[in-house]
Structure formats: C-alpha cells, structure tokens
C-alpha cells in the first residue's frame, strides 16, 4: 500500500511515528497510508524554511511574478490529473474538482501582478513640513491549515500570495486527502520556486497545535466558528 510522506525541502520525508488511513470515499476502502508528523518534524520544517527565506525575501518581485506565471501554466496543463487525485481521495466529481482548482488558479493569476501589488505609498505635505511614506514587507514564515473539502482551492488561496510577497510557507493539508495538496507544491517547485520555500507537513491535532503555538509563525486556517474558543 502506498505511503504518503511529508514534503520538506523538495524531498519526501517519512518523519513521525504514526500513520493514518486515506480512503477512497466512492468505494469506502483504504487506498493508502499517510505519515502523521509531530513537534520535531514541524520544527525541522520551519528551520528548513528559514534557510530558504534568507535568500527568497531578497528575490525581486519581478522574478517572483515570473515563477507565478510559470506556475499558472503548469496548473492548467495538469488540471485533469490533479482533479483525478482530488476525486480519488475526496469523492468530488471530476468536474467539481476542476472547478475548485480553477478558483485557485485565479488567485495564482492575481499573484502574477505582485510587482504592482507590493508598491508602497508616498504623500507630500501631510502636515507642515511632513511627508509620509509606507513600505510593504514580508512577515517571514507563514503557515496554512487547510480543510478536507477543498484540498486544492484553499491551499492556492494561501501559499502563492504569501510567497509572492516574499514569505516562506508551511502547509498542513487535511490528513484525509493530502495527495493533491502535495502535488501543488511539487508543481510550484517545477515552476521555479526553490525547494523548501513551501513545505508540507501532514498530521492531525499534534501538528496543528505545534504550528498554532509557534511564536514565529503566523497561521491562516479555515475553521468552524466554535473552534475559535476551543
């Protein structure tokens, strides 16, 4: 049976002592196993991203935009294959999976305009002898915790814009359908992104807690309102 591993620094990593089942909902059978990460693996992924970030944050917006254009083309060229991966692990129809992927690609297209989006502002004489200006700077390492129901759309809402703005990214997809999310990152590297800029850590609550509690990592996630007070 296939084992779905973490994807860190451009490599498949098996880290973590536990595994979970990945089902094909159409037949109700386990089709693969997924490695579940732990605190140590999360910290290793963050350290990997730190090393890449030191160079990436100084990469010009024009160069980042070039990678985004390449990435958009790769996503479009591989849309049928990605949709099949989503359908196999999630249960969406192929057409529904293609539709959700397209909504993600639209965000990548928006990220292609990052040189213009990152422009600051300057105002003359806002007060007597006072001029003001603003600069947009990266946050550093960001993380995204994404849900089962949209394994490609929501990751594409997160990491392309985050990296286009000069950040590195840790992606924690749902452990129930992780394959298509990992494939998004493989294609991102094929488009020209450096290995380790986006790392994928599979896992459950242990990984989620490690990311949320890490002081250096701002987290974006999709959740139920009740989770806000859990």
Regions found by a protein language model. Name each.
Residues 28-118:
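Glycine-rich loop-to-alpha-helix module at the N-terminal edge of alpha/beta enzyme cores
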Residues 223-230:
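Single conserved hydrophobic/aromatic residue that forms the stacking wall/gate
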Residues 131-132, 200-218:
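A structured beta-alpha segment of the ubiquitous adenosine-cofactor-binding alpha/beta core
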Residues 121-195:
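Conserved small-residue-rich beta-alpha loop and adjacent elements
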Residues 1-33, 66, 120-146:
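Terminal low-complexity tails and localization/encapsulation signals of metabolic enzymes
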Residues 160, 218-221:
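Periplasmic-binding protein-like
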Residues 74, 93, 150-151, 176-177, ...:
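Glycine-/small-residue-rich active-site loops that bind phosphorylated ligands and cofactors
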